[in-house]
Amino acid sequence: MTASRPKALQTFCLLLPLLVWMVDRSLCYKPVIVVHGLFDSSANFKNLLQYINESHPGTNVTVLDLFDNKESLQPLWKQVQGFKEAIYPIMQNAGRDGVHLLCYSQGGLICRGLLQTMPDHNVDTFISLSSPQMGQYGDTDYLRYLFPTYVKSNLYRLCYTQMGQTFSICNFWNDPHHHGIYVNVSDFLAPLNSERPEPNATDWKKNFLRLRKMVLIGGPDDGVITPWESSHFGFYDENETVLEMKYQMVYQDDTFGLRSMDYRGAITVYGVPGVVHTMWHSNQTVFKNCIEKWLT
């Protein structure tokens, strides 16, 4: 019997990796938190949930059911606070392993608000899916529905008022022909970018840089995010010529940590043609090529 023990131990050691894999493959997958966009709800993300469950079985995925549909027009700082209260317990349960944030459209700005204002967040990877990170300036069906008497060139007259800033879309309306007014009036995007003196800027930058990775996804056929390069932190100059991320003041001055993240190789950018705005979270090719590998 004594001689058989080493052989049994050897067999056990050989089988142990297989046993661990069989017990719980999900141990290697971090929780995923999904934040929806304007006029969306958790019901819009059934395909995305299916893709994640098929590729990473057992992953804890939470699609937050807050500020749905018309409620998504609430001011963005109010939404940031609401989502923060819902997300914080998930982060705490994840502990040192951390979580991933997958945030679509307007939700990408809400997630930036979370990342910059939470000193103890444990977000590993932030996936910004067709989100107007540098703002919005363009006529879209959404705008015509919300403000039928206003078009691109005139919307600043409403958005850059105290009343206008009570609408989420006005919180990131960035008119390049009225930049000075935007900087002074914007309640959300301008302070988030530290485009004007912000007392919390140093802390917000430190919080943002807790991220390990940021993935930026967008494309030229989006049809809603205008310019579409805003999803990559590009934006118009005063002549409506798009300047890419590295030529933006927020990058060059590293106002909230964008350049620092880029310098450490922590930003990945995907430009995907042929995808309209409402299909980013339902397109399996986008998931396979741009999202799946980051959810480990």
Swiss-Prot record:
A cellular component term, taken from the record's GO annotations: lysosome
Top-level taxon of the source organism: Eukaryota
Coiled-coil ranges from the UniProt annotation: none
Active site: 105 (nucleophile), 222, 277
Keyword Hydrolase: yes
Catalytic activities: hexadecanoyl-CoA + H2O = hexadecanoate + CoA + H(+); S-hexadecanoyl-N-acetylcysteamine + H2O = N-acetylcysteamine + hexadecanoate + H(+)
InterPro entries: AB_hydrolase_fold
Gene Ontology terms, MF aspect: fatty acyl-CoA hydrolase activity; palmitoyl hydrolase activity; palmitoyl-(protein) hydrolase activity; thiolester hydrolase activity
Disulfide bonds: 103-111, 159-170
Enzyme Commission number(s) from the entry: 3.1.2.2
Predominant place of localization: other
Short name of one Pfam family: Palm_thioest
UniProt keyword terms in alphabetical order: Disulfide bond, Glycoprotein, Hydrolase, Lysosome, Signal
SUPFAM superfamilies listed in its UniProt record: alpha/beta-Hydrolases
Localization terms from the record: Lysosome
Extent of the signal sequence: 1-28
Glycosylated residues in this chain: 53, 60, 184, 200, 239, 283
Alphabetical list of PANTHER family matching this protein: LYSOSOMAL THIOESTERASE PPT2, PALMITOYL-PROTEIN THIOESTERASE/DOLICHYLDIPHOSPHATASE 1
Family from the record: Belongs to the palmitoyl-protein thioesterase family.
Free-text function comment from the UniProt entry: Catalyzes the cleavage of thioester bonds from S-palmitoyl-CoA or S-palmitoyl-N-acetylcysteamine (unbranched structures) but does not have activity against palmitoylcysteine or palmitoylated proteins, branched structures or bulky head groups. Conversely, hydrolyzes both long and short chain fatty acyl-CoA substrate.
Protein name stated in the entry: Lysosomal thioesterase PPT2-A
Organism: Xenopus laevis
Chain's gene name: ppt2-a
